[in-house]
Regions:
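Intrinsically disordered, low-complexity boundary segments flanking structured domains
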Residues: 1, 51-53, 72-77, 91-97, ...
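Short, extreme N-terminal segment that most often corresponds to the first beta-strand
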Residues: 1-29
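Acidic, proline/glycine-rich low-complexity IDRs
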Residues: 2-8, 102-104, 109-209
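N-terminal start-of-chain detector that recognizes signal peptides
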Residues: 39-43, 58-62, 77-83, 135-136, ...
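A generic structural motif
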Residues: 39, 89-94, 191-198
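Aromatic- and glycine-enriched beta-alpha-beta binding-site module
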Residues: 62-116
Length: 209
């Protein structure tokens, strides 16, 4: 079975309020540089070779804090095993009362940015630039932004195990990656099937009330 015959999954953050807190304040030493990862991965040259993080929580055991760009050693080892392209920078974490977590952590950025939507087989609507009535595009690759996707069919050529999906602006993984995460018991990581039941709307997370 080829990799693409398996379902792909959106990788989600699943907090438990304990070792995987919903949110915690962070003090970085030195300060992190300004960066955006929505169009392309951040430039590694902007970062220090290592960081210290004062995490304002009493416990930290999650393996992939997606919003914080923080991953455990176990997550990085799995990515190495599955040939995932990523940037890692060592982070020394200090918790409340000077405690240290049991796991080692790294700043973590995916390097593979893939457009995986098969437009011929999918059902979708693209966003428009209201200023000039043209499709809103970004950069030399002319990446479109999507208002909605009613049917998401993945291109047959997709074979990577973990990458940043350009259409959804989210991390997406293969079934192989999902199975390995579950086998290893990685904490704070969930998966939403990118199958025929999946629907996307750019307005879902906006409060328009």
């Amino acid at each position: 079975m080829s990799p693409n015959q398996n379902c792909f999954f959106i990788v989600e953050f699943v907090p438990d309020g304990k070792g995987v807190p919903h949110f915690f304040d962070k003090d970085w030493i030195p300060d992190l540089p300004d960066y955006s990862f929505y169009d392309f991965p951040p430039c590694g040259d902007k970062f220090s070779s290592h960081y210290s993080l004062k995490a304002k929580t009493s416990n930290l055991s999650g393996d992939y804090f997606i919003e914080d760009d923080l991953a455990s050693m176990d997550m990085c080892v799995l990515c190495d095993k599955l040939n995932v392209k990523f940037i890692r920078i060592p982070v020394e974490v200090e918790l409340y009362r000077g405690r240290t977590p049991n796991k080692k952590y790294f700043l973590f950025f995916l390097k593979s940015y893939l457009s995986i939507l098969d437009e011929e087989r999918s059902i979708y609507s693209k966003s428009t630039d209201l200023k000039n009535e043209n499709f809103n595009v970004s950069g030399e690759d002319e990446r479109f932004f999507y208002d909605s996707i009613e049917l998401f069919k993945v291109k047959d050529s997709v074979s990577e195990n973990l990458f940043f999906c350009n259409e959804l602006m989210l991390p997406v993984c293969s079934a192989v990656f999902k199975e390995e995460c579950e086998r290893l018991g990685l904490e704070g990581v969930g998966f939403k099937p990118l199958d025929d039941n999946y629907k996307y709307s750019a307005w879902d997370d906006l409060d328009l009330s």
